Structures are given as structure tokens and as C-alpha cells.
Amino acid sequence: MTESEQRWLDQGRGLSPEWTWSFTADAPLVGLELARESGDTIVADASGSVYILDRRGRIVTLSRGLHELVDLAWSDSGTHGAVVVGETTLAVLNRQLRLVWTSDLREPIRAIAVDPYGHHFAACLEGGETRILNNTRKTIGRFKTTRRLSHVRFVTGHADLIATADNGLLCRHHLDGTPLWGEPCWSNIGDLTITGDGGAIFLAGLNLGIQRFDGNGNSQGTYVVEGTPNRVSTSYALNRVVASTVERGLIWLDSDGEILWAVETPEEVLTLRCDPLGAGFVCGFEGGRVVRLDWGAPFP
């Protein structure tokens, strides 16, 4: 990123971050993940390329040719990830970006997630069913919800997953599909993020702000920000939250929702991933640029 391209960072309010690194994919962004344990950033673009970047934004592994790539999820350990190819195929990749297996689920896939260790994979389907597969491609759990799910995350330390529909439902299920709770959620939802233990849940609630829930689905209030939040990500332990808005706002908050820094971005944000310690975050723009911003050194 050139000095002129970094200039937008200086237009913010509050304590500005340091630009740590930037990377530009070959095509518009499809997905972005931060492996919280390994520190790798995984990027997928519309040309079918998948990149693994190290902690300094350098390419470690690159794979091309996954045509019709539409979504990406990755384990915290960095060992395995999953992509959606076409509408209905779930494909699992290893750290070398070699294909491990594929499964045609015969329904459009709305959302995917990988557990922190790369052992289990969740796929939320168009018809309202969610399937959980293990690393040998066996379906070990499934459940159906009244509204089709659009965002899903595995909980670290518990064999559970938390998910939400675009509107109307926030829920938690065990790995075998057993429902633990489900709560109505009447705002439109742009994104879902959870702390590592699932004790804090945040929804980018668009016109209703950033909504916070506890691990049992009880409302803990709303973080009010300027604009319409559509992307959100939290640190592993709850100390920082980053959000973006439809109006191209980018906002860095503390655990109580106090705004520490805010800026207008030069283009639309597709994905945000907060550093597990809350030192900073990775921001993926729709056009293909990925930027790492930090307050203090994120690594030695």
C-alpha cells in the first residue's frame, strides 16, 4: 500500500492504528479468515485463488483453479479449512491447500464454519437444515430450523455451534444437532461473531445497531454507533470489537461499546476479523485488498 493509499487512516477520530501490512488478491474478495492460533490470514478471491498469508502478510501457500468459489471458513489451528464451490459442494482443504475431500450436499449452501481444531465442518442449507460433518466426511449431526441460517460459528471448548438467520432467529445447538436454545431476533442481521467461549455474542443488526447477547441468548443491550453496522468481529476474550457500516464507516470499540477510533474507508468492507488478543484486526475490502491494522505490536 502506497503512502497515498494509506492516507484514509489519518482521517479518523481517536487513536489511529499502525498499518502493519496489506495484500491485494488477483480478483474481488470472496472470503477472509484469521486462524487465531497459527496467526495465518486466509484469503479467497473470485478467480478461484486461495492464499495463506503469514503474520507479516507474506504469501506462504497459494492455490489456483477452485472455480465458482463462493465462501470460505478456516480453523483457528490453521490446519484445515473449507470452501463452497458452486452452490452445493463443500470442499475441505489442508494447510498446503490440497483438496482433502468434497461433498455434494444437493442444496445451496448459505453458510459454513470449521471448528477451532479443523475436525468438524458445519454447512447451513437453503432449505433450513444444518449438517455437521467430521473430517472423514461422515455426517455426525443435523438439525432443521424454522428460518434458514445465514451465519454460523463453532464455540471453542464446547461441542456447540451458534448461528443466526438473516432475521428472526438466534440459536445454539450441540454438535450432534441437539437444540440448546433458540431466541427470536427481529432485526435484520448482517454478521455474527462470538468470543472464544461463546459467552458473548454480537450481531451486526443494521438499523438496530450492534446487538450483544450472553451465551444463553439473553440480550445484553446494544452498542450504538453512527451508521448502519453490517459487519462485526470480536477478540477471543471480550476486550475489543471491530465493526463496519453500510456507509463505509470502520469502528474500533472496547468491551463496553465505547468508540476508540472511527474512520471512513475508501471502499466497501466485505469481512472483518479481530485479532484474538484485541491488538488489532484484519480488514478485507470487496475489491480484493486486505489490510492489517494494529494498536501496538501484534507479534515479535
Placement of each model-derived feature along the sequence:
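Hydrophobic beta-strand positions that form the internal "hydrophobic ladder"
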Residues: 41, 81-82, 121, 161-162, ...
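Blade-level signature of beta-propeller repeat domains, shared across WD40, Kelch, NHL, RCC1
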Residues: 266-300
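Loop/turn residues immediately N-terminal
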Residues: 47-50, 87-90, 127-130, 159, ...
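A short beta-strand motif characteristic of beta-propeller blades
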Residues: 18-24, 58-63, 98-103, 138-144, ...
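A short helix->beta-strand "capping" segment at the edge of beta-propeller domains
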Residues: 2-28, 56
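Residue-level detector of Asp-centered blade-edge/turn motifs that repeat once per structural unit
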Residues: 36-38, 76-77, 116-117, 156-158, ...
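Beta-strand-rich domains and repeat architectures in extracellular enzymes and scaffolds
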Residues: 21-48
